[in-house]
């Protein structure tokens, strides 16, 4: 042992609550199902899942720049740029000069992009409607509120500026 270096005592991680583990397992399963469902549905439209998420953000957002899109999708700028490049080649998105910032470009959906996003959205919402049909409306509303709250809480813990591998805030 090197006497010049202080001894570091690492405390054992506290045991996870059973609810935490059960929650994690249930949420992980739901995410896996939705990821598969998204890949399965979206690939029918000759568009990747990342491109679909970006197209949805551009159609549903207002005045998005590439930096805005990257932050919204938790992507680095170069990855977001490649996704937008593909959407632009397919004729779904166009870049236009920002009226207030000459160094920046705004992402705008083309009419074909709007139509594609609406087709995919209708397909997915039809699936969601079938999924929720067995639940009472009050349960659906409560689930929606809880999922939104969970998404906000999770987003507040994400380092969108590049991640924090191996570090939990």
Give names to the regions the model predicted.
Residues 44-48, 79-82, 86, 136, ...:
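Short glycine/proline-centered loop/turn elements that form peptide/ligand docking sites
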Residues 36-79, 90:
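N-terminal helix-turn-helix DNA-binding core of bacterial DNA-binding proteins
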Residues 1-16, 138-169:
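C-terminal regulatory/oligomerization modules of transcriptional regulators
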């Amino acid at each position: 042992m090197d006497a010049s270096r202080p001894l570091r005592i690492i405390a054992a991680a506290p045991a996870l609550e059973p609810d935490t583990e059960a929650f994690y397992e249930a949420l992980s399963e739901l995410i896996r199902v939705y990821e598969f469902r998204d890949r399965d549905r979206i690939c029918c439209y000759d568009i990747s899942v990342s491109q679909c998420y970006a197209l949805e953000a551009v159609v549903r957002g207002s005045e998005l720049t590439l930096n805005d899109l990257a932050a919204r999708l938790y992507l680095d700028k170069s990855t977001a740029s490649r996704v937008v490049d593909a959407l632009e080649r397919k004729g779904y998105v166009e870049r236009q000069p920002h009226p207030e910032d000459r160094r920046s470009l705004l992402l705008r959906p083309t009419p074909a992009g709007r139509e594609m996003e609406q087709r995919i959205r209708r397909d997915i919402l039809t699936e969601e409607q079938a999924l929720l049909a067995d639940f009472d409306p009050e349960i659906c509303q409560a689930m929606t509120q809880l999922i939104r709250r969970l998404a906000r809480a999770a987003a507040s813990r994400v380092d969108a500026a590049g991640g924090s591998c191996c570090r939990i805030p």
